[in-house]
Amino acid sequence: MAHLRLGNIIGSLSRVPKSILDVGYGDGSFLKVCSNIIPKCYGYDVSSYPAPDGCEIVSSMTDQPYDVITFFDSLEHFEDIEFVKDLKCTAVCISVPHCHNKSDEWFENWKHRRPDEHLWHFDKDSLVNFMERMGFVLCSHSNLEDTIRKNPDQEEPNILTCVFRSFKRYESSNS
């Protein structure tokens, strides 16, 4: 999955990022793959996981600029997501459960509905609208993670992945 995610970012940007911050890095598998080709790799997590070799843990997502910031299955867990407007980066990659919300009954029975855990629910349009308000424009979108995770009987996309570019340009030693 980590290679697929990194390939999507590189393909969407048409280049290898100079630095990357993975928010909610967990076991560090994505950062470990990134560290093979990205010079500066950083992780932010609410839990105290060890950072993979060659990667650094940071205590804030908004203090310094990064080329790319990723939220793989993590953005929907934050109580207040307005901090996204304060991110200093050229691009953001977000992967979230794809909420189709066809009816109250559908939503009530949705497998990703976890009221105490998933605090935000997005479909493509709602995620794009939110990110535009935060200062980002859609670069690419896909359901690429479904190629690995998807149940063959499932009719609709399960995981939504989008790459956004910032309206602003950040320059620093990290980006």
Task: Indicate residue ranges for each PLM-predicted region.
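Conserved N-terminal segment of class I S-adenosyl-L-methionine
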Residues: M1-V68, F72, I81-L87, E105-W110, ...
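Residues lining the SAM
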Residues: F72-L75, S95
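Catalytic P-loop NTPase motifs of RecA-like helicase/translocase cores
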Residues: F78
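Conserved beta-strand signature within the Rossmann-like core of class I S-adenosyl-L-methionine
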Residues: C89-N101
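Conserved active-site loop/cleft motifs that coordinate metal ions or position small ligands
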Residues: C93-S95, C139-S142
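Short alpha-helix
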Residues: H118-M134
